């Protein structure tokens, strides 16, 4: 490898330069672009000698900030890389003190920023690499990547014993040292964490495994043997086994082992402090960001009257309480870091505040979907307001990001605590609390995500139109107490259907999703009065289930997604049924009709012509939907989200005209189309089982039609002989009679008239045809006109015959 490739590898190994996602064709160009802003250089010097960098711009946005970072690196090199290397007393006196100085005048800051004389920059880094390799700096770990923010120096690094520093000096002398079985004092280490190999030459192990080190290399990777397998592993994942713990080997050898002072304990302590300081700094930064969002944007917006008070409350949520809580948390962590390391209880601090934190963040996440809805509806006004307050364009994005910070911060806690645990001593008093805190934060983060998803779905249901909705608007039911997606199984049926249950103060609403998940379909409502909730034990047929029963409700089995969802439903329903039983004891069953099947009742608003009708179920107070054969089902058959469209079989019976419609039914239908179709259904005659017509029946029906036609003609003649007033009255009577008997007259008319007569039967009309008044009226108007023409022809022929 050339010098540029070696330098890139060195920086990536130290963790100060991110590894590129693809192969680098020009290492020197990649290195020049990476070093231009000076951030990587400052990270490098801080990695080698923590506390050296005093001021750094993590994300420089101007030329001056980039040059400031580069000059800070050069200043740190000139001030700090004068290292006194003290050798053990056994060494010759002339080697007691050696001074190595890296000149800071090797390259100029402007040269690096402008891309000039990059060879000088590269030469300086190569020299720095060689110097630090000789004295053993920066080779302790490659797994822990420091924060991009400034990391302060700690006393634990400055107070390392002379013996430890001497051991680091000799670490370079023992690199590439092959330790064979003849080694007398072979280095033995014990795994502190689990490690899974990602390459073939790496060694996998579990926590607690004892590994025999066969080679110590710079860069943080050692070679060792475990259970007959040899491979490379990260050195900061293990700790050296003390002399009292080492197994006695009967074999002897001549090769030396590394100095006894070479231990990772001091390194882990230093990184523990680094991680803890990082937690404190990021926590303080997060608290300041919340204060900025409140003081700069939300509080002025509250007094500007640009939005209603309700929308302002949605945007604010409980952000004020969270901000106050985070300030208190920062103070608690600062007090904790002032204690000696052995007495620091960071995990205990988080555990003590977890109940309060859980309440605050769950409340915030439940309100967040409503806040997003306000942001969407008033994006223009809010964007303009934010920009007037100094926010960068687009201003709405600044507010959206600010309102998302609480749950974004919540997701980071498990990772931060995991890193703290990695660099903690095995027998630290706070280790168990750290582990409990990690589990608590993971659980809280999952709950917050679930609450957000549920509230987003709830908001969608309350704001969008629901297909086949019956009764008053959904907003009149009150606030949603609880909702989730469940599986519903009715008594006597083995089929389970996905449903969305929404619990309101007095009603349990049941919805299903459309096949394309584009909306929701109304399935029914159950009154909470008289409802009995029974929690069921898990079995082979159901898990996390409860049962709904009652005097007016047929037994329903509800299966929840998890145990937490089950507990929430049982508690809310039991509490709700007690409240409604005391406060609202009399609720009429028919006031909350329930459709247990995805039925499409014959109402003017229904648009599902080919849907399968629902059966009659008095226990749920469903509408009397007839089956295909005219007989109601006796058992409930739960269908899918939407019933499939199945074509009806055709037979000769389809040519048979339907029974005539009673005029009272038509008048009732025209009177009020918005009411429930129960009244109209009662007026319709029940269909008898269909059978093929015989010749005798056809002749009888034809003769009856002829007699009725003669009666009509006589009435017409009588009307012509009376006064104008009487003729007008009889004309109305004739039209009503014609309306009532048009199906019979249609049998002797032409085929097209017979086809139109079949369409006139209300019992055979599809629901979509009944949805429009104009279509319904046009059918009867056409019949009256055609029947009137036929009767007038018959009348003329009769008069001519009499004459």
UniProtKB/Swiss-Prot annotation:
Matching SMART domains: CH, PH, RhoGEF, SH3
SUPFAM superfamilies xrefs: Calponin-homology domain, CH-domain, DBL homology domain (DH-domain), PH domain-like, SH3-domain
Residues covered by the PH domain: 473-578
Post-translational modification: Phosphorylated by PTK2/FAK1; this promotes interaction with RAC1. Phosphorylated on Ser-694 by CaMK1; enhancement of GEF activity and downstream activation of RAC1.
Biased segments, Low complexity type: 752-765
Regions of compositional bias (Polar residues) in chain numbering: 593-606
Region described as Disordered: spans on this chain: 580-655, 678-704, 748-773
Coiled coil, from the record: none
Modification type Phosphoserine: residues: 153, 176, 249, 257, 518, 694
Protein's recorded name: Rho guanine nucleotide exchange factor 7
Source species of the chain: Homo sapiens (Human)
Source taxonomy: Eukaryota, Metazoa, Chordata, Craniata, Vertebrata
């Amino acid at each position: 490898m050339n010098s540029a490739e070696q330098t890139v590898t060195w920086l990536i190994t130290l963790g100060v330069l991110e590894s590129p996602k693809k192969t680098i064709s020009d290492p020197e160009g990649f290195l020049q672009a990476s070093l231009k802003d000076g951030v990587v250089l400052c990270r490098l010097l801080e990695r080698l000698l923590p506390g050296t960098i005093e001021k750094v711009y993590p994300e420089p946005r101007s030329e001056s900030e980039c040059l400031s970072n580069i000059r800070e690196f050069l200043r740190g090199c000139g001030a700090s890389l004068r290292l006194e290397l003290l050798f053990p007393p056994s060494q010759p006196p002339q080697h007691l003190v050696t001074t190595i100085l890296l000149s800071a005048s090797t390259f100029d800051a402007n040269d690096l920023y402008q891309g000039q004389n990059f060879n000088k920059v590269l030469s300086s880094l190569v020299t720095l690499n060689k110097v630090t390799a000789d004295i053993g700096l920066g080779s302790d770990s490659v797994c822990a990547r420091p924060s991009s923010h400034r990391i302060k120096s700690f006393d634990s690094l400055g107070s390392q014993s002379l013996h430890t520093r001497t051991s680091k000096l000799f670490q370079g002398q023992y690199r590439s040292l092959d330790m064979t079985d003849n080694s007398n004092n072979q280095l033995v280490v014990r795994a502190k964490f689990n490690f899974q190999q990602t390459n073939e030459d790496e060694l996998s192990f579990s926590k607690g495994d004892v590994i025999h080190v066969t080679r110590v290399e710079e860069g943080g990777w050692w070679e060792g043997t475990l259970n007959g397998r040899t491979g490379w592993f990260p050195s900061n994942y293990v700790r050296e086994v003390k002399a009292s713990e080492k197994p006695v080997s009967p074999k002897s050898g001549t090769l030396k082992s590394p100095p006894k002072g070479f231990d990772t304990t001091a390194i882990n302590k230093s990184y523990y402090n680094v991680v803890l300081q990082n937690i404190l700094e990021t926590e303080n930064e997060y608290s300041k960001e919340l204060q900025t969002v409140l003081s700069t944007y939300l509080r002025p917006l509250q007094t500007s009257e640009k939005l209603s008070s309700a929308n302002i409350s949605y945007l604010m949520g409980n952000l004020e309480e969270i901000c106050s809580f985070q300030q208190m948390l920062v103070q608690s962590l600062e007090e904790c870091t002032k204690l000696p390391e052995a007495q620091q209880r960071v995990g205990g601090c988080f555990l003590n505040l977890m109940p309060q934190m859980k309440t605050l963040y769950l409340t915030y996440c439940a309100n967040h979907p409503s806040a997003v809805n306000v942001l969407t509806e008033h994006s223009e006004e809010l964007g303009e307001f934010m920009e007037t307050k100094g926010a960068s364009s687009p201003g709405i994005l600044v507010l959206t990001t600010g309102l998302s910070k609480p749950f974004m911060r919540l997701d980071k806690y498990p990772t931060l605590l995991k890193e703290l645990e990695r660099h903690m001593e095995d027998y630290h008093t706070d280790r168990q609390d750290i582990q409990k805190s990690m589990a608590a934060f993971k659980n809280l983060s999952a709950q917050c995500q679930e609450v957000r998803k549920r509230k987003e779905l709830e908001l969608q249901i309350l704001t969008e139109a629901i297909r086949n909705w019956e009764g008053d608007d959904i907003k009149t039911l009150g606030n949603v107490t609880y909702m989730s997606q469940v599986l519903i199984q009715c008594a006597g049926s083995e089929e389970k259907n996905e449903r969305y249950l929404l619990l309101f103060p007095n009603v349990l609403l049941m919805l299903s999703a459309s096949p394309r998940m584009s909306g929701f379909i109304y399935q029914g409502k159950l009154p909470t009065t008289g409802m009995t909730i029974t929690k069921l034990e898990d079995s082979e047929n159901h898990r996390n289930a409860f049962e709904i029963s009652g005097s007016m409700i047929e037994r329903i089995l509800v299966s929840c997604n998890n145990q937490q969802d089950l507990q929430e439903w049982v508690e809310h329903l039991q509490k709700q049924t007690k409240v409604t039983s005391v406060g609202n004891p009399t609720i009429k069953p028919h006031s909350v009709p329930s459709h247990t099947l995805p039925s499409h009742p014959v109402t003017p608003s229904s648009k599902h012509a080919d849907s399968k009708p629902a059966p009659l179920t008095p226990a749920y107070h469903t509408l009397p939907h007839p089956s295909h054969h005219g007989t109601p089902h006796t058992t409930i058959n739960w269908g899918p989200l939407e019933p499939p469209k199945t074509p009806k079989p055709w037979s000769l019976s389809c040519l048979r005209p339907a029974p005539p419609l009673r005029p009272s039914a038509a008048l009732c239908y025209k009177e009020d189309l918005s009411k429930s179709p129960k009244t109209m259904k009662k007026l319709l005659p029940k269909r008898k089982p269909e059978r093929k017509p015989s010749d005798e029946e056809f002749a009888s029906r034809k003769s009856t039609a002829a007699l009725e036609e003669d009666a009509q003609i006589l009435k017409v003649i009588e009307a012509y002989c009376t006064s104008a007033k009487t003729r007008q009255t009889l004309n109305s009577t004739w039209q009503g009679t014609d309306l009532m008997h048009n199906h019979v007259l249609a049998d002797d008319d032409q085929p097209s008239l017979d086809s139109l007569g079949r369409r006139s039967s209300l019992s055979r009309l599809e629901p979509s045809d009944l949805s429009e008044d104009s279509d319904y009226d046009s059918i009867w108007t056409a019949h009256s006109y055609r029947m009137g023409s036929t009767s007038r022809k018959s009348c003329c022929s009769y008069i001519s015959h009499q004459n």
